[in-house]
C-alpha cells in the first residue's frame, strides 16, 4: 500500500482483504509526493504505488542481504513484525509501515534463536 507524509492511506492504494481472506496490503510505504529523478535528471515529485513498492522492496532486499541466514517467509515475518500496526493489522494499512532498524534487530534475534 501507499501512504502520504502523514502516514495516511492514499486514495489510489488498493485495499484488502485478498480473495482468500488474507490481510492486504502486507505493509505500506511512501507513495504520495515522493522525490524522484525524472527522465531529464531533474528532481521532482510523483505519486503512486509504483513508488511505494520499490522503496519497500529495496529496504527488504537490504534487510535480506544483512540476514542471509533467513528464508523468504522469515524475512516477510520480520518486516511485518517491525511495522507500526503489527499488533492490529487491517485491510487499509496491512501491518503498517515497516521500521527497518527494528526489523534488523528482530531478524538478528531470529538468527540467534535458529543457531541454538
Where are these regions (language model features)?
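Intrinsically disordered, low-complexity, compositionally biased regions/tails
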Residues: 20, 62, 98-100, 111
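Short intrinsically disordered coil segments
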Residues: 15-17, 42-44, 49, 113-115
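Residues at secondary-structure transition points
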Residues: 7, 22, 54, 100-102
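Catalytic-core segments of hydrolase enzymes
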Residues: 1-38, 80-83
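Alpha-helical scaffold segments in soluble metabolic enzymes
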Residues: 11, 26, 58, 62, ...
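Secreted peptidase-domain scaffold signal
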Residues: 102-116
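Generic alpha-helical secondary structure signal
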Residues: 16, 71, 97-99, 104
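Hydrolase catalytic cores
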Residues: 31-93, 97
